[in-house]
Design a protein with these regions (language model features):
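C-terminal and inter-domain tail/linker signature
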Residues: 1-133
Protein backbone atom coordinates (compact mmCIF):
# COMPACT_ATOMS: atom_id res chain seq x y z
CA UNK A 1 0.00 0.00 0.00
CA UNK A 2 2.67 2.47 -1.00
CA UNK A 3 0.11 5.00 -2.23
CA UNK A 4 -2.06 4.83 0.91
CA UNK A 5 -1.71 8.54 1.62
CA UNK A 6 -3.51 9.33 -1.63
CA UNK A 7 -6.42 6.98 -0.82
CA UNK A 8 -9.56 7.88 1.06
CA UNK A 9 -10.10 5.96 4.34
CA UNK A 10 -12.70 3.60 2.87
CA UNK A 11 -10.36 2.57 0.07
CA UNK A 12 -7.51 1.94 2.50
CA UNK A 13 -9.60 -0.32 4.71
CA UNK A 14 -11.26 -2.13 1.80
CA UNK A 15 -7.86 -2.73 0.17
CA UNK A 16 -6.30 -4.11 3.35
CA UNK A 17 -9.25 -6.36 4.20
CA UNK A 18 -9.66 -7.58 0.63
CA UNK A 19 -6.00 -8.63 0.59
CA UNK A 20 -6.31 -10.29 4.01
CA UNK A 21 -9.49 -12.18 3.14
CA UNK A 22 -7.83 -13.21 -0.11
CA UNK A 23 -5.04 -14.88 1.86
CA UNK A 24 -2.37 -12.14 1.73
CA UNK A 25 -1.79 -11.80 5.47
CA UNK A 26 1.45 -9.84 4.97
CA UNK A 27 -0.70 -6.78 4.30
CA UNK A 28 -1.74 -6.81 7.99
CA UNK A 29 1.79 -6.56 9.39
CA UNK A 30 2.06 -2.76 9.35
CA UNK A 31 -1.44 -2.03 10.60
CA UNK A 32 -1.91 -1.84 14.38
CA UNK A 33 -5.10 -3.50 15.59
CA UNK A 34 -5.12 -6.04 12.79
CA UNK A 35 -2.54 -8.41 14.31
CA UNK A 36 -5.19 -10.60 15.93
CA UNK A 37 -6.91 -10.95 12.58
CA UNK A 38 -3.65 -12.16 11.03
CA UNK A 39 -3.44 -14.87 13.70
CA UNK A 40 -7.03 -16.04 13.27
CA UNK A 41 -7.41 -16.03 9.49
CA UNK A 42 -5.15 -19.03 8.74
CA UNK A 43 -7.37 -21.15 11.02
CA UNK A 44 -10.49 -19.89 9.27
CA UNK A 45 -8.96 -20.57 5.84
CA UNK A 46 -8.09 -24.12 6.96
CA UNK A 47 -11.61 -24.75 8.27
CA UNK A 48 -13.25 -23.15 5.22
CA UNK A 49 -10.93 -23.65 2.21
CA UNK A 50 -13.52 -22.07 -0.11
CA UNK A 51 -13.94 -19.06 2.20
CA UNK A 52 -15.23 -15.94 0.45
CA UNK A 53 -15.81 -12.40 1.70
CA UNK A 54 -18.30 -10.38 -0.32
CA UNK A 55 -18.20 -6.64 0.26
CA UNK A 56 -21.67 -5.19 0.87
CA UNK A 57 -21.29 -1.55 1.84
CA UNK A 58 -19.26 0.99 3.76
CA UNK A 59 -19.79 4.27 5.58
CA UNK A 60 -17.16 6.97 6.13
CA UNK A 61 -17.32 9.66 8.78
CA UNK A 62 -14.14 11.64 9.29
CA UNK A 63 -11.35 9.22 10.27
CA UNK A 64 -13.75 6.30 10.80
CA UNK A 65 -14.77 3.69 8.24
CA UNK A 66 -17.43 1.03 8.80
CA UNK A 67 -17.54 -1.93 6.43
CA UNK A 68 -20.17 -4.67 6.10
CA UNK A 69 -19.19 -8.05 4.59
CA UNK A 70 -21.06 -11.31 3.96
CA UNK A 71 -18.79 -14.31 4.54
CA UNK A 72 -19.43 -17.78 3.12
CA UNK A 73 -17.67 -21.12 3.10
CA UNK A 74 -17.95 -24.88 3.51
CA UNK A 75 -16.76 -26.36 6.81
CA UNK A 76 -14.08 -28.84 5.63
CA UNK A 77 -11.49 -28.64 8.43
CA UNK A 78 -11.28 -28.31 12.22
CA UNK A 79 -12.68 -25.12 13.73
CA UNK A 80 -12.25 -24.35 17.44
CA UNK A 81 -12.14 -28.08 18.20
CA UNK A 82 -15.10 -28.97 15.97
CA UNK A 83 -14.41 -31.60 13.30
CA UNK A 84 -15.39 -30.82 9.71
CA UNK A 85 -19.12 -31.09 9.00
CA UNK A 86 -19.15 -30.33 5.23
CA UNK A 87 -21.94 -27.83 5.92
CA UNK A 88 -22.08 -24.51 4.10
CA UNK A 89 -22.28 -21.36 6.20
CA UNK A 90 -23.16 -17.75 5.52
CA UNK A 91 -22.57 -15.07 8.13
CA UNK A 92 -21.88 -11.38 8.54
CA UNK A 93 -18.92 -9.26 9.58
CA UNK A 94 -18.94 -5.58 10.45
CA UNK A 95 -15.60 -3.84 10.87
CA UNK A 96 -14.89 -0.32 12.07
CA UNK A 97 -11.47 1.19 11.45
CA UNK A 98 -9.90 4.54 12.23
CA UNK A 99 -7.52 5.81 9.57
CA UNK A 100 -5.06 8.62 10.34
CA UNK A 101 -2.62 9.95 7.73
CA UNK A 102 -3.17 6.91 5.52
CA UNK A 103 -2.60 4.35 8.30
CA UNK A 104 -5.10 2.12 10.06
CA UNK A 105 -4.53 3.05 13.71
CA UNK A 106 -7.51 1.28 15.26
CA UNK A 107 -9.55 -1.72 14.10
CA UNK A 108 -12.56 -3.46 15.61
CA UNK A 109 -14.55 -6.26 14.04
CA UNK A 110 -17.70 -8.12 14.99
CA UNK A 111 -18.03 -11.52 13.33
CA UNK A 112 -21.28 -13.49 13.40
CA UNK A 113 -19.80 -16.63 14.96
CA UNK A 114 -23.12 -17.47 16.65
CA UNK A 115 -24.71 -17.77 13.20
CA UNK A 116 -21.85 -20.06 12.13
CA UNK A 117 -22.33 -22.39 15.08
CA UNK A 118 -26.10 -22.48 14.60
CA UNK A 119 -25.59 -23.41 10.93
CA UNK A 120 -23.06 -26.10 11.89
CA UNK A 121 -25.54 -27.56 14.39
CA UNK A 122 -23.42 -26.82 17.46
CA UNK A 123 -25.85 -24.29 18.92
CA UNK A 124 -29.61 -24.90 18.61
CA UNK A 125 -31.68 -22.27 16.88
CA UNK A 126 -34.61 -21.06 18.94
CA UNK A 127 -37.10 -18.78 17.22
CA UNK A 128 -37.86 -15.60 19.20
CA UNK A 129 -41.56 -16.52 19.56
CA UNK A 130 -41.03 -20.25 20.18
CA UNK A 131 -43.39 -21.30 23.02
CA UNK A 132 -40.96 -24.09 23.94
CA UNK A 133 -38.47 -21.54 25.27
Amino acid sequence: MTDALSMDPATIVRTVLAAAYGGNLAVLADHPGLGALAGALPKVFQAFPDFRAEYQQHLVEGERVAIHWILTGTHRGPLFGLAATSKAVRFQNVAIARVVEGRIVQFNSEVGWLAVFVQLGVVPFVAPNDPAR
